[in-house]
Amino acid sequence: MSDYILSAEINLPLLKWMTSFKLNSNLFSTSRNQSLKSISEIYRDLQYNIIPPKDEELQNLWTHLYDLNNYYSNSIEYNQVEKSLMGLKSKYRNSYLKGYYEIINLFQSIANDFEKLSSPISQTTTTTQIPIISFNKNSVLDAINNRKNENKENSFKFLSSFESYVPTVEEIKRIYCIDNKEILIDKSCTLPVEYKLFHSFSLLNLYVYLIIVIRIIKLIGEINRQSSNASENQEILHLLKEYSLHIKSIEEFQLQLKLNNLYYQPTKKEIILKYFVEINSNNNLNNLNNNNDNNLNNNNSNNNLNNNNNSNSNFNNDNNLNSNINSNDTSISNNNSIINNNSNNSNTNNNNNNNIINNIKIFEFSEKELKYSKRYYSYNEFTLRPAELPNNSLGIETQNLIFYTTSNYNSGNSNSGSNNSNSSNNNSSSNSLINNSGGNSNSGLIPKIKFNHHRPKDINPKIVLAVYNNILSMSKVIDKKTINSMNEIIKNNNNNNNNNSNNNNNNNDEDDSDYEENEFNKEFNNQFEFGSEIIEQDKECYICRFRSEFISFCNYCKCKMICDLCSVNKVCWNCYFKVDKVSGNEQQQQQQHFIPLEVVVKLKDRKYPRLIYMLLRSYSFRDLMNTLYQDRFERDSVISPKDRFTYKLHKTKLYNFHLVLPNCKNPFQTKEIQIFDDYSLIIALRLLMNFILSNYIIDQKEVPPPPTQPSSRPQSPPTVSPLTPLNNHHHSGGSLLEHAIARNFNNNSVEVVSDDNTSGSGTGGSNSNSNTGGSYNKFNNNNNNRKNSTGSGTNSRNNNSDNEYSYNNNNNNYNNNNNNKIINNNSIVTVENPILWNIDKFILNVIESSIDIEQSLKIPSSCIETEIEPFASGGQANIYMVKHIDWPMLSNCPEGSYVFKQFIETKDSLQLEEDIEREMYEEKIYQTYKTGESVDNFKYNFSNVEQTDKKSLETLFYEEVDKLKRLQFSDYIIKMPAISDDNPNKRGMLLECATAGSLKTNLLEYRSWKLVIRFMMDICLGMIDIHKCQIIHRDLKPDNILVFENFNSSEASDENDERQREFGGLICKITDLGASIQKELVHDNNFTSTFHTDDYVPEEYGRFQYDGEKVDIYSFGCTFFEMVTKHRYQYKHPTPLHRDFLTTDFQYIPIRIKTLIASLLAEQSQRKQSFNEVYNDLQDIYKNVIPGLPDIPLSPISTNGSQFCKRCNPQK
């Protein structure tokens, strides 16, 4: 068979099918079905002739290929696929895997040859890129004719077997440590699937899994439409169900996720009824107190208080809601629900409590249906509330956000902030969940809907990238003039294009014609007849909700209103995805696409971060997947010192994007900033913030300072310019965060300041015309005073900072903290289905440590007297011998009992040079981008700075102290009696001194088999304790194993007596936990590097999928090998060398010990699973193998010396 055929993968149609979705074929390289091989496995067998294929197998293979090609020819656009893959070459480390374009061309030639070969008419030969397949023509034709029906069945077997190439749910949970913390499917994103960016590797696998099933169903539907035989259709469906190994439908796929606690969609009542009770009761009480303060007549205050206290609802196990709600009419809805609770007056008795559940009406609606409900809401009517999902079976409570609405039918009252059971009685308290925002007496005729928003609290990282859905589309703000102009534009476009679609839809999205009004919209329109009035000159961007008279329509679709920040060359995102702006033609962008992301920016002195939308460009989805999955660096290559800036051994880069910014000077041009590491991202965010500040801040009118003393009567706030964008700036995520932004150019930083909590713009509850409350912010920047007036309502929190003055209208401000559930740190929440995205794994933890250390463990540094010069050093610390300790608990210890490990800054000249160059580059590129100049001359590749470089010395110190403190219970871990942290220049820990040195210094002295195996058992017990505390050591080697004399254990046993009798009390203890890491962070690509010794780590170390415990087992195996052979191989990942030497050399080593070492140094899948297994084997060897063996030779010399062995090559 030709070498051309052997140099590529096998299946053309399936390969084209996969590449049409830009999926990585490497994801399908592991098949668990023994009878069906994957594409890569078949190719590998042919490439290396592991299993020589038989003629019959080849005939069957080509038959499958031919039939599948016929089935998929109508559903795959070959020209489009090949065009999208044009120029893409292989980026795999294994050179025998070709690029997609090369494989497609090769298979196209093979398919053409096979077509000619199988055709009885064509007898002529033509020159092709590859030779004609050399096998019997008649046998192929006979196979096709005789197995026509069987081929169809085999083809579907082959197709459905692709489900087995993706890891199972159990494997994903185990490999990626999901542990019920991630929800894996996001359905609310409106972008096409190939434009989605998943920052979760487990989600990527299940995403591929789902795509396969969807594709199968689509292919079946295509076949059904082409086939007229109904029985044949049933046969096809039967074949699919029969040979689908994991799932048969998308519904079953969702069911499987739910059964495995990977997907949970709460029911409508269990969330609403439970969390409405807590929030409503608290809000009712606060609203009651606020209204009572504003009422001149307080005769009914006690009665109202009692009634409000009775309105607390209990959600019991029988799902009954017991409450007494004092409201005229309240409607609540979450993500999929609207709840109406009706009570006639404030004195409703408890007899109606059991019947309140019957008044609940549930209307199902999705985000799409809500935004297509032909209702345009004012942005200040939308907020979000926090909520939690019910406890699952494992007792783990998932925290989330939900939507619900409240409606206040108040047709006769001019006060939108209170409800009256009697029109003449203005003293009754409002029992609505939230006060509606209305500005005048006529607004009371219009029922209002309001969403309360609460963002996750205490997001610690300074910079967070997260995939976040655009929930802003739920809060459309379009004035009547804009609606009319949009109708005219749509009508004109439809007439020009001879499009007969319905023009009654007023929404802004491209798929308006596909929307059909459902039952929800009919019911919704009947019950909620409301509208909103806004200033006509204040238009709103449909993406960021920024309102200004300078907002313009998209140049292409002429429908969407966009601002400069949210557009590219005055074109909206949806159009930019599909249209080539350079040529103006409607062509799919095959080589690159843009991904909308939100950036959560934590700036100086800001408790809550700012969310910013940005566009990221990746040249292809395939490149993105390769970036996430493949190691770009050759591990065994020698790196010179000058290449240190660009070399990172185990770091997979997540930054491969461009940030698109409009040009401040020329709005018709854009600037693209490449984001390739943390520093370039910081620069990009600074530029983005600078653009926002320079374009969107309009100087406001001077506002007089607030009164120094609170007045007894409410005062009207000063007037504010209606063009002030910050008053109406709608934050991403649908929140009502009103910002006061200030710039400080002294340190080239941008600061975003806002209230400490999300503020809902509401109205006062007084009897006069409602006045919007305000909080006045005053900031001093470069001696320039800027004053800002932002809307503040009932859901705002007072900000008591030094540079901000708060004036509360009607005493309506109260603390929201008691009502809001605390969301998990670093969590992003979507909208349509409450989906929690855990983004901790994509954040490098560079924050200062907040570990609490017991005071009893601390002693002053002045009480520790050490030698002047350290006797050892390494990493971030120097080791000093302690002479005396002036501390009551330790003063009686003899000299030489302890050492002091002092943490120091150890940056070499290269690191210092890199820091200086990086700072200069940051400033240069920032100023260059800021002025709009070109930056082509400023090319600099930052190295991915290691964890030790990013974390401060204080953080590293406290983290190691915390780990050692948790391991003090173990007799096989070095003891730490005290630490000293009062002096930053002498911060360190007191450790017991190893009087016998380390295993490295005594390697040749320990020749007794009993002593060596006993030491190995000690190390095993120490590693068991470390793994029990969920810690991975990552740097286990003879240097970090200390030997102590006169061991006295707290527990008396025969082993301890034997140790004292035969070994003189010698015991091994593990030290140096500075390289260790928490087990849950092992799979974080930000933590897969920085700490290791190449001689003692396996090849998989540093990859995303490596097992931390097995890495420690491998390091233990290397140490064991060095102890019994006295040889050390200075070679990266020396598994082959170990295996060769164990089989050919060192005949004095028992076979049982060789077998154990080989199992420790094997591949990851064949390696020992835990140290408990290793310890059991060592115990058996100690009892049954070691007795009677002679000692290890004094200087064992290898007969097959290796150039990498230090003992075989002492001159090196």
From Swiss-Prot:
The active site is at 1035 (proton acceptor). InterPro entries: Kinase-like_dom_sf, Prot_kinase_dom, Ser/Thr_kinase_AS. GO terms for cellular component: membrane. Residues 288-329, 412-439, 489-517, 703-733, 751-813 are annotated as: Disordered. The chain crosses the membrane at residues 197-217, 673-693. Glycans are attached at residues 229, 299, 309, 328, 335, 341, 344, 391, 419, 422, 426-427, 435, 499. Its EC number is 2.7.11.1. It is an enzyme of class 2 (transferase). Residues 508-517 have a biased composition (Acidic residues). It holds the Pfam family Pkinase. GO terms for molecular function: ATP binding; protein serine kinase activity; protein serine/threonine kinase activity. Keywords: ATP-binding, Glycoprotein, Kinase, Membrane, Nucleotide-binding, Serine/threonine-protein kinase, Transferase, Transmembrane, Transmembrane helix. It comes from the Eukaryota. Residues 865-1182 form the Protein kinase domain. Residues 703-720 have a biased composition (Pro residues). It is a multi-pass membrane protein. It is found in: Membrane. Belongs to the protein kinase superfamily. Ser/Thr protein kinase family. PANTHER family: UNC-51 LIKE AUTOPHAGY ACTIVATING KINASE 1A, UNC-51-LIKE AUTOPHAGY-ACTIVATING KINASE 1A. This is Probable serine/threonine-protein kinase DDB_G0284491.
